[in-house]
Amino acid sequence: MSDMHITLKVWRQDGPEQKGRFEEYAAIAAPDMSFLEMLDVVNDGLEEGHKIPVSFDSDCREGICGMCGLVINGVPHGPGKGTTTCQLYMRSFADGDTITIEPFRATAFPVIRDLVVDRTAFDQIVQAGGYNSVNTGSAPDANAVLVSKDRAEE
């Protein structure tokens, strides 16, 4: 699989009281990279250029904790139905795509910096046990990504 050349339009905001703006970045990503791995690579490039990296949250990177919530091309968590941002892979996009990345925008989740929001309201619901009201069955295996035989033998 060849690398993809992607243009990112990323929401940047220096602080909760600051005005935000979109900034564009060029990214090169492998199709089997997760979306957050691609953001890590972009941040590595920004740091090498002595620029401030894009702030974003992630914790488990296994689709469990919900810390990685972003709005991608206007859709919460991106184009993958029933998936979290950390379980979204670059193969969901095409070479040459422009991807817009924003934080969740809701009064309950004020922006702290860039793509990081204050999750206090959500965390209080989770701590009270109020978010888990439906039996959804067993959880899918974390990070279950099929790898082709040819790729596995490389």
Region locations from a protein language model:
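Signature of N-terminal electron-transfer/Fe-S-associated modules in redox systems
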Residues: 1-153
